[in-house]
């Protein structure tokens, strides 16, 4: 697995970028220079490829401690595959940054200059000054506002080779391919179609308990205006159209710096509950607005590959425009959950809460959907005919056949001659075509490419 290291002087936003790329808060972030002194690392995925992301300590000669941090950082950089050097876009380039950057460039590894904190037009104009670093790969970012990351991800993806799959999915896929006979329908795992497990998640005081009470029409959880009233997870089941829907009301997730005692335990329970859920109701506060913590909680949902419905609670108090809000969520804040339906409700008044029950049944049906192999391959043939697969350095890239190998969530294998040549943008095109033909609203769609007649996903 390739590794990506974030390097730069203190307080340029390395930890914030690390948290953004990891979709969770791992490194401590602060306005105080040099908050991160130790090396943090975590596995991430960029589009369909996985990598190890490393957050180094800040490069600074101002004290003895940071001299050691710099020495360690350079050592880790030598062992890494890709280097991202961060600078502060609100400050003019300085010779110290150039010196650090050139010393890293000599390592002969893929390296990019990341200009962070480019938050407005004035910052964009100033960022051009960094062109004198003499590097082609310069990316202007605003990590705080989640702007500019798509271009960076596309550049990084070119250097990553190892395909990302859900944990344990690699073994499942290889086992499937070993026993699958081309052209035959596959016997899927049994999923109880009459019992649906739904996790209710969101930050503190967005109205999760009120929503649960409205859904089951009784006071089951303690409801209060005090942030974080609900600590213990509460299960409640309802029967809707002959289906049992089991709800789990999770304790609200606070900002990490405020988590103490029972609240920290509740955060761990929340992730555990998601791991046992099939569908998540991601509850947002439409009256108070959205923040970075909402995005991190959404990242937990995406991490578990659940069916998902985004619930805009307290809509009766909101002044937001619904269409503009949905566009903001899908194109900006929750791009990785762009397939999720968005429903506005008022849990306290019960308005539109009933819509959620029907939507849960629909999403669960999509979540457990089985695609007939012949129909899937007809779609793939038509899609590749309309937009042929790009050649790989002059060599033909072919998809021999496609087959769904799992459900809940649905997973599709593309058997190819050159699986590594399948660019994420073409994979996304195929995903979009499949979503158009088959209803996968609210459901993640996993596509894995493999070499024909081999367990390997490469050219060897």
Swiss-Prot record:
What residues bind GTP 2, as annotated? 202-209, 249-253, 313-316
- Residues in domain KH-like? 369-453
Q: Which PROSITE patterns match?
A: G_ENGA
Q: Which SUPFAM superfamilies match?
A: P-loop containing nucleoside triphosphate hydrolases
Pfam short name (any one): KH_dom-like
Q: Which keywords belong to this entry? A: GTP-binding, Nucleotide-binding, Repeat, Ribosome biogenesis
Q: Where does GTP 1 bind?
A: 8-15, 55-59, 116-119
The family annotation for this protein states: Belongs to the TRAFAC class TrmE-Era-EngA-EngB-Septin-like GTPase superfamily. EngA (Der) GTPase family.
Checking HAMAP family in the record gives: GTPase_Der
Binding partners and assembly? Associates with the 50S ribosomal subunit.
Name of the featured protein: GTPase Der
